[in-house]
Amino acid sequence: MRLLGCFFLIFLTWGSARAQGEYCHGWLDSAGNYQAGFQCPEDFDTADANICCGSCALRYCCAAADARLEQGSCTNHRELEKSGVSAQPVYVPFLIVGSIFIAFIIVGSLVAVYCCTCLRPKQTSQQPMRFTLRSYPPETLPMILTSGNLRTPSRQSSTATSSTSTGGSVRRLSSSRADPGYLVSSPPPPYSSAHSIHLNPSSTFLVSNQYFPYPLQPEAIANKSCPDFRQS
């Protein structure tokens, strides 16, 4: 019984394979459109149309063995592989080239900065500058010396004033001594003291002649008392 069952299955399989016929693979037509493959015979074909006939660009099922198509010689029977990546736009290559150029500029700038930082010599600590006349050109030395002299006008003016006053007092003293009829003294201060002293005949008190309209004799001065300016 098992053998009969096996033979029956083999017969059904062979009969179904014989009834199906050839398989026409999918192809690309002349317009570039893909046509899906099919099994001969199709639904609208007769039962004996189990052979794939026609050309590489147009395929159909037929019963004539001499019209059979050698599908192995066709190159347009393969289905285009569907990729998950969509078609890239036109500007993508330009975007890639621009990105590479910008990256090259950035990398070059970083390398240049690194090289300049590492190869630049270290600066030594600057020592304080010393002022010397040798450091200035000869043309500027008169200006420096002149400016140095202009900084001390007060000392020179005070020295000149003191020398002038000293010279004037010396001249007045010498002119007073030249005249034997007058007694020369320095001018008294603008204040006077209430105390008075008697001058000794041996001591003399010199009074300038500018305070008297007439000449005085030494004897008249000896018997008079004058205010004491030393105690003030």
Curated annotation (Swiss-Prot):
Membrane topology, from the record: Single-pass type I membrane protein
Keyword Endoplasmic reticulum: yes
Compartments where found: Endoplasmic reticulum membrane
Disulfide bonds: none
Transmembrane intervals: 94-114
Keywords from the UniProt entry: Developmental protein, Endoplasmic reticulum, Membrane, Signal, Transmembrane, Transmembrane helix
Record's GO cellular component terms: endoplasmic reticulum membrane
Cytoplasmic side: 115-232
Lumenal side: 20-93
First-listed, main subcellular location of the protein, grouped into a coarse class: endoplasmic reticulum
Region (Disordered): 146-185
Signal peptide region: 1-19
Miscellaneous notes: 'Shisa' was named after a sculpture form, common to southern Japan, with a large head similar to the Egyptian sphinx.
Role summary: Plays an essential role in the maturation of presomitic mesoderm cells by individual attenuation of both fgf and wnt signaling. Regulates head and somite developmen. Inhibits both wnt and fgf signaling through the regulation of protein maturation and cell surface transportation of their receptors within the endoplasmic reticulum.
Family, per entry: Belongs to the shisa family.
Assembly behavior: Interacts with fzd8 and fgfr1.
Official protein name in the record: Protein shisa-3
Gene: shisa3
